[in-house]
């Protein structure tokens, strides 16, 4: 079997002389036309610290591909900075960018008939976007994470970007002055790399390591450390070998691999966004996965790591303590991981973990021992009830009041909600409802980090609940329930809630309930009318037209056949 199984379609034979002529212009020589052509999907950008160091990694990937006997072709893909667009109209483009990234990588790799792809990403949507494309195309591939940022520091306290969001709430509540707010702002993000807690980017990179689509230890490395660049070059070598062996994503991204990823996400206390993204990746890989699967795994996997946003440490601390391989070995020792799942190296998960210790070092407390976990069960709970018949996603660890029944405060946008919080109009016992922020209704399913951080900063984190058909940042914690489906824009019950209604959030019973009679609910449903589309042209209009429910991953290519 030729190594250039796909690309020979454009490099072999007399008829391909014009194709080869153009390839010669970009550096191909006679001997290169039989080598596998490998795309390097480069998400470098200076709009965000998450991606500003990626170009250097892409160059190391190019070197690695060449050394291993492949022919690299570098191309760009996009990124949105979730942190910078947070709380603005621009955030509507964040989840949209996941699918734009997927479509762009698929378009280039298939348009150029590449033999494989090494994708490098940093900010939140880079990871799932790349993996959706990889699963769709089913050509040999590996993902390289751009790396995590190192923590900032102020008055001896580690900072992340979430510290700055929470400082806004503290300032508005009169807890800190403008000088301290400015100091936190200046020190929160000290250099290159993705947001430093177990937020969405680090959650998804950890998931990909657990799935076997990234190299061991690579998901928790700091962006600015030399080992990150070395790991990138090694990834290129591994990919070229995978092309020779024709190890395909369909052999790796299996039901077992995704279950392994979910187990690791629970153990590290990962982001709610992982639920949405793994559903979408599973769909692209033709793997059956539902919200109920997350709940089944959550019930049996403990939270082992003390990581921000609700914990103490950042991802670089996790790396120093033993990283994802140590967490995986602990899960494996307790039969909570599938050891026979294949990885891009050609080895199984079990084989890769053979020499990894099964207990965390005693001189650290980032990774807890099995008999003393942070929490006995996972933190990402699936809630259902008349407010979410398809389901909703809640973070339930670190919540002092796992059951709350309160007065609904209803807002039809994130901005209106944030204004009320900062103005002191939200009281203890309220349940905030933020709707028309779902995949179709936003459109784009914005993250509610600004309101939730303002709640924490105001000292109301364990005193109010917040539910939304939008999403939450990986930096969010507290009594929050997102991904409520069906969403308001399609007539879900969340659209029918009125100011002053009583709502129950019960994490123990996995319940999200609007406390009105079925008859009253049906009356409201009969008079509800859908809103006119907010956007009628451009990418947001297309997205709103195509996107599916968050309960199935908010994918844009469902039901097209």
UniProtKB/Swiss-Prot annotation:
HAMAP family: IlvD. Keywords: 2Fe-2S, Amino-acid biosynthesis, Branched-chain amino acid biosynthesis, Iron, Iron-sulfur, Lyase, Magnesium, Metal-binding. Binds 1 [2Fe-2S] cluster per subunit. This cluster acts as a Lewis acid cofactor. Gene3D superfamilies: IlvD/EDD C-terminal domain-like. Its EC number is 4.2.1.9. The active site is at 473 (proton acceptor). It holds the Pfam family ILVD_EDD_N. The lineage of its organism: Bacteria, Bacillati, Cyanobacteriota, Cyanophyceae, Oscillatoriophycideae. Homodimer. InterPro entries: DHAD_IlvD/Edd, Dihydro-acid_dehy_C, DihydroxyA_deHydtase, DiOHA_6PGluconate_deHydtase_CS, ILV_EDD_C, ILV_EDD_N, IlvD/EDD_N. Mg(2+) binds at residues 82, 124-125, 447. This is Dihydroxy-acid dehydratase. Functions in the biosynthesis of branched-chain amino acids. Catalyzes the dehydration of (2R,3R)-2,3-dihydroxy-3-methylpentanoate (2,3-dihydroxy-3-methylvalerate) into 2-oxo-3-methylpentanoate (2-oxo-3-methylvalerate) and of (2R)-2,3-dihydroxy-3-methylbutanoate (2,3-dihydroxyisovalerate) into 2-oxo-3-methylbutanoate (2-oxoisovalerate), the penultimate precursor to L-isoleucine and L-valine, respectively. GO terms for biological process: isoleucine biosynthetic process; L-valine biosynthetic process. It comes from Trichodesmium erythraeum (strain IMS101). [2Fe-2S] cluster binds at residues 50, 123, 195. The modification N6-carboxylysine is found at residue 125. The keyword Iron applies. Belongs to the IlvD/Edd family. It is an enzyme of class 4 (lyase).
